[in-house]
Amino acid sequence: MSLLSAIDTSAASVYQPAQLLNWVYLSLQDTHQASAFDAFRPEPTAGAAPPELAFGKGRPEQLGSPLHSSYLNSFFQLQRGEALSNSVYKGASPYGSLNNIADGLSSLTEHFSDLTLTSEARKPSKRPPPNYLCHLCFNKGHYIKDCPQARPKGEGLTPYQGKKRCFGEYKCPKCKRKWMSGNSWANMGQECIKCHINVYPHKQRPLEKPDGLDVSDQSKEHPQHLCEKCKVLGYYCRRVQ
């Protein structure tokens, strides 16, 4: 055994890992050839000792025959191959064995399963300037998006959700025609005179005192036949304040 260990350590120090793997494959191939050769050996006669037991009892010329030398070579190569394969595969795997690899993968799976895609904490709302009035409740201290009277996003059909009349801007999604009206109400649309479909405003501003475009719009006759508010009420909607 001391001779085998000396051979193994000297071989491991001389050969590179790739050469060691080739050596292992060659040794395994030699063992397969030896086992195939043993399959064709004749059956021992009755009363004769097995060749393994009679190996040490042979004459010196029999011990030096090619058959016995091949057995010795295959035995030594098999021992070297097993030792080298154990050392190579232990050094090649960072986990040491397949069981350790499976344990490492399971731990990684559990680690990634714990990671959930959570939205970041909502940043505190920015305070508006001191003189800023909310466009919905007309109080100071918050923007319209933080107004307590505002409906949740997606419920209303118009930007404005109050009860006052607004100045709204419209754009027909079919013909792309744009127009403005000083008779815009919350969740009420106007009919496009070209496509005859109901269009909701994409911009609204409550009317306190008309100015700018609102003044010019006030001088025009209100198209009651196109106003959804007038259709719902059944009379001129501007009388409702």
UniProtKB/Swiss-Prot annotation:
Assigned keywords, A-Z: Metal-binding, Phosphoprotein, Zinc, Zinc-finger
Domain of life, per lineage: Eukaryota
Record Pfam families: ZCCHC24_C, zf-CCHC_2, Zn_ribbon_3CxxC_2
Keyword Disulfide bond annotated: no
InterPro entries, per the entry: ZAR1/RTP1-5-like_Znf-3CxxC, Zcchc24_Znf-3CxxC, Zn_knuckle_CX2CX3GHX4C, Znf_CCHC, Znf_CCHC_sf
Zn finger region (CCHC-type): 132-149
Molecular function per GO: RNA binding; zinc ion binding
Phosphoserine, modified sites: S65, S93
UniProt protein name: Zinc finger CCHC domain-containing protein 24
The species this protein was found in: Homo sapiens
Lineage: Eukaryota, Metazoa, Chordata, Craniata, Vertebrata
